Amino acid sequence: MSETTCHMSISLDGFVAGPDQSLEQPLGRRGIELHRWHLDEPLHEADARARDLLLRPRGAYVMGRNMFGPIRGPWQGDWRGWWGDEPPYHAPVFVLTHFEHEPIELAGGTTFYFVGDGFDVAFARASEAAGGRGVDIAGGASTVRQALASGVIDELVLDFVPVLLGSGERLFDGVADPRLEPVEVIHSPLATHVRYRVGR
């Protein structure tokens, strides 16, 4: 049976992005600090293991509009995502939005589909497109909260980074206890990576 996964870097005070996200600062103020563990080479052995989990191939992805780009309201211009002409997904990506948009097909097998009918519809479409190869909930925080509320996540990996952001996008606000069971813990000087099974 295919599994639904989610992998998020998080501050010690529970934020997955800093405040004031923008085109210039996609992760908000200081948000980049949450990702140094997999951006700064050479990687510690534990961080390399966690990055392998982050980049493992999946059959399809679900993400929020905020994850896809900084534009709010009706679509403007020809924005195609943060990742250039060949995004790292190599699979269909279903983007939650309140505004219609034609699919965007890019190199390497990534096509962004825009879904205005809510999380459950987007997840159902992603599951069908994945063809048994599993779905990943790619973020951001609001989309992960919806996925947890819907009970579809089987495995959640959290990369705890020893910083305090103070404000921004909290991951677990308003989320009922998902009954997380740790199954693997690895750590480096930059982060502690915990892989959880999610209860039902």
Regions found by a protein language model. Give the residues of each.
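Enzymes that bind and transform nitrogen-containing heteroaromatic metabolites
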Residues: 1-200
